[in-house]
Amino acid sequence: MTFEQLIPLIIMAFALGMDAFSVSLGMGMMPLKLRQILYIGMTIGIFHIIMPFIGMVLGRFLSEKYGDIAHFAGAILLIGLGFYIVYSTILQNGETRTVPIGISLFVFAFGVSIDSFSVGLSLGIYGAQTIITILLFGFVSMLLAWIGLLIGRHAKDMLGTYGEIVGGIILVGFGLYILFPI
């Protein structure tokens, strides 16, 4: 692979990773330990490897209409997760909040990475080099997720008890933006 071929993939990796950054910014406003931030970033990175890989494999066999379904499903997952965070924050009123562990971490990572499935479909149709592409997507998304989580963690301290609600609203807003781009 030449440098000229690598540049578009790097740009695409950052574009996909910005989704992870934006959503992680909101998620970082939850009470997270550094170990949880590490796991969340790694999980997002792994999903950004798995989802485009599946998309690239299926992209050679499926029509382009499934890209719209993946896009829609990712948006709905983010909106649902955002509403859940706002709801649980208001309901629990100062108690320990739900943090993204177990199945909720996988739902979160899946929702953030589902757009990379659509990109994988397109790249599979065009025959992009699979290994380099998916590793680049995973690494950049993991790095940007960590940055977003850490910035969100510090922003939470400035926002006080409303930080988690703001984080949930960011997730809902991002999901709505995916559904209805301006």
UniProtKB/Swiss-Prot annotation:
Keywords annotated in UniProt: Cell membrane, Ion transport, Manganese, Membrane, Transmembrane, Transmembrane helix, Transport
GO cellular component annotations of the record: plasma membrane
Keyword Lipid metabolism on entry: no
KW Transmembrane (keyword) present: yes
Principal location: membrane
Membrane-spanning intervals of the chain: 6-26, 37-57, 71-91, 101-121, 131-151, 162-182
Protein location: Cell membrane
Protein topology in the membrane: Multi-pass membrane protein
Pfam family, one: Mntp
MF terms in GO: manganese ion transmembrane transporter activity
Free-text function comment from the UniProt entry: Probably functions as a manganese efflux pump.
Family: Belongs to the MntP (TC 9.B.29) family.
Protein name as it appears in the record: Putative manganese efflux pump MntP
